[in-house]
């Protein structure tokens, strides 16, 4: 211990730390271990989440590898929520708030025990961003190694399927378009194994973005769960984190800069990633002390082409195909051939720059990862729309909108909750030409900003995906497709313009112009605003009550702030 200068010396060095060492020895730590770096392993194993059900064994592998590399591993667990299982009922209100609990939990364990470095093992939707937020707070050497995606399902006729296929199947079944037996086949075959759901949904989007941010090793976002390659990545991450702990860096805030966030959004735009990545990456930026305006995303989208179309944008390509084609680094390498799209100098946990990493990659399938000369679209798969209906922005997954649709004008049909909207959709009230407005489902109003996968999937499954639009102050699943705008800010519960919309109002969605417009005169909107009454909070007690009182707007990542802030 004499030459040790690591952070954990605070809990293990000197005569006055004899009680601390005694407690550590009770866990199996030896005198020889006291001179080694203490490595926290934030796992997220939980039985009810298929993306996490295998993480106990995976975490043990990482723990063993850290010890082999010369570190002292301490594994701990966070909670996790499966958004698919929580979808469409009260449970979804707990999904986004779980991100804050995860961030707080990781911060608490790391700071309480003054650990030297951190390996994060996330996988699904809110776990990855929650751990990213914690990493920004504690700012000790950190590597992310996710649990990996599941393979796509295979139906009896050879077609591929995934979770979104089932959600859309529910809509088709409600219209008599598929039988009970066909729906049961989807249920049985679409999700064949453990791992994060197999499309470019929120979980895989965030795990891919970890690579682009520089916080994960190449392959993290795409190598399948339980594959030999995933295990090799875990061992490599363990070796590297011990090196970083001894060197004292690089640290997360050295890596996550505005330029690194640009790179992450550029990847997201090139892949048509989930709109949730906007919410989560803004939250990570906020925790890192970075002001990142939404307009910067639109500037990127204007010059970043859409190169890699993955489910739900196409039924034919899943994350496993992206991995076989070369993965995230191959996409970045292809994108780097267009000047002004990426920042190659950004640092990564490997010690190399991101440009050095993508230089080693190869695009092995130009049908899966298009060359920049032949993109799916010259501009990207993600956009932020502004206008009198969304003064602080609304997020749109352009890559999941039919390419034939560039503008949509329709009449509003308003619902003050997701449940009301589902009743209206399945009850036949929603017709071609409608813009479905689902409000009071934002961070405060929900509370918890629930995802709207059930209504969007029902609309698509019923064959209305090109004829009906949906806008909301809530969120969407990464699997949502169609003309769907979420994260409308300010939200209805805060008196945002979405609260003033009435049935029959004309709404125009202009995708190329990045405008969302309520075609109602300003003086009429002022009259409506004067008559508007702020509703009482839906929840006043417990975690959701505290969350609703402290959460900020979607345009700043829906992070929590104490009242004095």
UniProtKB/Swiss-Prot annotation:
Record EC number: 4.2.1.9
Active-site residues, Swiss-Prot/TrEMBL: 477 (proton acceptor)
GO terms under cellular component: cytosol
PTM-bearing positions, type N6-carboxylysine: 126
Coiled-coil parts of chain: none
InterPro entries in the cross-refs: Dihydro-acid_dehy_C, DihydroxyA_deHydtase, DiOHA_6PGluconate_deHydtase_CS, ILV_EDD_C, ILV_EDD_N, IlvD/EDD_N
Needed co-factor(s): [2Fe-2S] cluster; Mg(2+)
Top-level taxonomic group: Bacteria
GO biological process, one term: L-valine biosynthetic process
UniProt: Mg(2+) binding residues: 83, 125-126, 451
One Pfam family this sequence matches: ILV_EDD_C
Reactions the enzyme catalyzes: (2R)-2,3-dihydroxy-3-methylbutanoate = 3-methyl-2-oxobutanoate + H2O; (2R,3R)-2,3-dihydroxy-3-methylpentanoate = (S)-3-methyl-2-oxopentanoate + H2O
GO molecular function: 2 iron, 2 sulfur cluster binding; dihydroxy-acid dehydratase activity; magnesium ion binding
Chain ranges passing through the membrane: none
Cofactor notes: Binds 1 [2Fe-2S] cluster per subunit. This cluster acts as a Lewis acid cofactor.
List of residues binding [2Fe-2S] cluster: 124, 197
Pathway(s) where this gene product acts: Amino-acid biosynthesis; L-isoleucine biosynthesis; L-isoleucine from 2-oxobutanoate: step 3/4; Amino-acid biosynthesis; L-valine biosynthesis; L-valine from pyruvate: step 3/4
Keywords: 2Fe-2S, Amino-acid biosynthesis, Branched-chain amino acid biosynthesis, Iron, Iron-sulfur, Lyase, Magnesium, Metal-binding
Family according to the record: Belongs to the IlvD/Edd family.
NCBIfam families, A to Z: ilvD (TIGR00110), PRK00911.1 (NF002068)
PANTHER family: D-XYLONATE DEHYDRATASE, D-XYLONATE DEHYDRATASE YAGF-RELATED
Subunit structure: Homodimer.
Function: Functions in the biosynthesis of branched-chain amino acids. Catalyzes the dehydration of (2R,3R)-2,3-dihydroxy-3-methylpentanoate (2,3-dihydroxy-3-methylvalerate) into 2-oxo-3-methylpentanoate (2-oxo-3-methylvalerate) and of (2R)-2,3-dihydroxy-3-methylbutanoate (2,3-dihydroxyisovalerate) into 2-oxo-3-methylbutanoate (2-oxoisovalerate), the penultimate precursor to L-isoleucine and L-valine, respectively.
Protein name, as recorded: Dihydroxy-acid dehydratase
Organism lineage string: Bacteria, Bacillati, Bacillota, Clostridia, Eubacteriales
Gene this protein is translated from: ilvD
